[in-house]
A protein has these predicted regions:
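Conserved mid-domain beta->alpha element of the FAD-binding
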Residues: 6-27, 31-34, 157-158, 240, ...
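A short coil-to-beta-strand element that immediately follows conserved catalytic motifs
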Residues: 176-179, 194-196, 249-267
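Active-site substrate-recognition segment that forms the wall
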Residues: 196-229, 233, 237, 241-249, ...
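Conserved N-terminal glycine-rich FAD pyrophosphate-binding loop of Rossmann-like flavoproteins
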Residues: 36-52
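Catalytic P-loop NTPase motifs of RecA-like helicase/translocase cores
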Residues: 37-38, 165-166, 292-294
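Conserved N-terminal helical subregion
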Residues: 1-5, 22, 49-190, 228-237, ...
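C-terminal helical "tail/cap" subdomain of flavin- and related membrane-associated enzymes
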Residues: 1-3, 65, 75-77, 81-82, ...
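Histidine-centered metal-chelating micro-motifs
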Residues: 163-164, 183-185, 205-208, 290-291
Length: 393
C-alpha cells in the first residue's frame, strides 16, 4: 500500500520534498496558501552543495539551463568605489559529483522547473489552501484544510516558511526572531560583459551583484534596519538608492536607474531557531519553517533542497516512519545550525560601521577569505547526510 504525505507550503522545500517523495512512490498532496505562484525574492544564487542535491532530484541540468552559471566559482570583492580587493573561489565538487560552483536564477524560473516535475509526477497541488487544524493517532495524521477537506495521511510536512502555520499549531512558542538586518533587492538588465558574482564592501554595508540569466542580474544589499521597520512600496526605490549611495563602480548605473517601475523587494530578515527535534509524531518541519537563516552564506535554498533529499533517502531505507523522522532531526539539525551560526557571524562582521574597524576586517579577509570558504564547505560536507549513511534509521 502506498504511503501518503501532505506537504504544506510550495516553496523550495515543499516542492523539492514533493518531487523526492513522489519519485519514491509516495502519494503526495501539496497545498499552498497563495492563490497563485508568487515569489518573495526576485533572484537567488545556489552554491555547489545545493546543486548536488538538485542533481539527486533529477532537476539540476534544467536549473543550470534556466539560470546563469559561474563556471569557475569566482566571487569578486570590490570596495565601495569599485576597486578590486580580493577574490575567492567556491568549490565545484561535492560528494564525488562535479557541479556548477555558483548558479544565479530567478525564483520564478526555479519554480517553473520544479512545478513541471510536480505535474509529470502526478503530485496533487491545491493553491489557495492551507491547514486549519491537525490531529494525530499513533501512526497517522488527519488535517482539516481550509477548503473543507479532511485529509488523512501517514506523514505531514510543514514546509510553509518563516511564518509557518504548521509550526504555529504544534510549536506555538517558537517564533521568528528579527536579525537586525534588512535586505534590499532589485532586478536589472545585464550588460554583456558582467558575468561574475560581485560583492562590494563599505563600512556597515554590503552590496552584491549576481547574474540570474543571460539577460538579467539582481542587486542585493544588506544593512542594519530598525526593529519593526516598515516602508511603503512606493518608497523602496528612493530608500534603496539612499542606503547604498556610497557604492559606485559597477553598481552605480543600477542604483541610479532605480525608479517607480523597477522590480524591487525589501525584506526584514528573520531567523527561526527550533529545538533539536523538528517533529511531533508524524508531523515534521523542513526548510525555513524549521531553520530560516540570515542570507550571508547564501545557503537558504541549498538547505531546503537538502532537507528534501535527506528525508526521502531516510524514508526509503525503512518502513519505520517515526524512526526515520528521529534520524532526520539528528542529521539535519547540526548542519542547519552550523549554517545559521556562520551566516550570523558574517552579518555581524559586515555590519561594523567604524571605518578603521572595517579596514581591519578587509585586511584580515585578504589573507583568510579563501581558507574560510574552504573550511566552511569542508565542514558542511562533513555534516552532510552522505557521511552518515553507514548508520541505519
Amino acid at each position: 500500500m502506498k504511503r501518503a504525505v501532505l506537504i504544506c507550503g510550495a516553496g523550495i522545500a515543499g516542492c523539492c520534498a514533493a518531487i523526492a517523495l513522489a519519485r519514491s512512490g509516495w502519494t503526495v498532496t501539496l497545498v499552498e496558501k497563495q492563490t497563485a505562484w508568487r515569489f518573495q525574492s526576485s533572484g537567488i544564487f545556489v552554491y555547489g552543495n545545493g546543486l548536488a542535491r538538485f542533481h539527486a532530484l533529477g532537476v539540476m541540468e534544467e536549473m543550470v539551463a534556466a539560470g546563469f552559471a559561474i563556471a569557475d566559482g569566482r566571487n569578486v570583492y570590490l570596495d565601495a568605489d569599485g576597486s578590486p580587493l580580493f577574490e575567492t573561489f567556491y568549490p565545484g565538487r561535492f560528494d564525488g559529483l562535479e557541479v556548477t560552483p555558483i548558479l544565479g536564477i530567478r525564483r520564478a524560473e526555479m519554480h517553473r522547473v520544479l512545478s513541471g516535475h510536480l505535474s509529470r509526477l502526478g503530485v496533487e497541488v491545491a493553491l489557495g489552501c492551507t491547514v486549519q487544524s491537525i490531529e494525530q493517532s499513533r501512526s497517522a495524521v488527519s488535517a482539516v484544510l481550509s477548503d473543507g477537506r479532511v485529509l488523512a495521511c501517514d506523514l505531514l510536512l510543514g514546509a510553509d516558511g518563516i511564518r509557518s502555520r504548521v509550526r504555529q499549531l504544534l510549536w506555538p512558542d517558537v517564533q521568528p526572531r528579527y536579525s537586525g538586518f534588512g535586505v534590499w533587492r532589485s532586478v536589472h538588465d545585464r550588460p554583456a560583459g558582467l558575468g561574475d558574482k560581485i560583492m562590494m564592501m563599505a563600512p556597515g554595508l554590503r552590496l552584491g551583484i549576481m547574474p540570474i540569466s543571460a539577460q538579467q542580474l539582481y542587486l542585493f544589499g544588506t544593512v542594519v534596519e530598525p526593529v519593526d521597520a516598515w516602508y511603503a512600496r512606493e518608497d523602496w526605490a528612493r530608500l534603496m538608492q539612499s542606503r547604498f549611495s556610497v557604492f559606485r563602480g559597477p553598481a552605480a548605473h543600477f542604483l541610479d536607474e532605480l525608479g517607480p517601475q523597477s522590480e524591487l523587494l525589501y525584506t526584514a530578515v528573520e531567523e527561526v531557531l527550533m529545538p533539536a527535534a523538528w517533529h511531533q509524531g508524524r508531523v515534521l518541519l523542513i526548510g525555513d519553517a524549521a531553520h530560516a537563516s540570515t542570507p550571508f552564506m547564501g545557503q537558504g535554498g541549498a538547505m531546503a533542497v537538502e532537507d528534501a533529499v535527506v528525508l526521502a533517502r531516510l524514508l526509503d531505507r525503512t518502513t519505520d516512519i517515526d524512526r526515520a523522522l528521529e534520524r532526520f532531526s539528528t542529521v539535519r539539525s547540526p548542519a542547519c545550525r552550523f549554517v545559521q551560526d556562520a551566516s550570523r557571524q558574517v552579518g555581524v562582521s559586515g555590519a561594523r560601521s567604524d571605518p578603521q574597524e572595517h579596514a581591519g576586517i578587509l585586511d584580515a579577509m585578504r589573507t583568510t577569505a579563501q581558507a574560510r570558504v574552504d573550511e566552511f564547505y569542508a565542514r558542511l560536507e562533513q555534516l552532510g547526510f552522505d557521511h552518515h549513511q553507514e548508520e541505519t534509521p
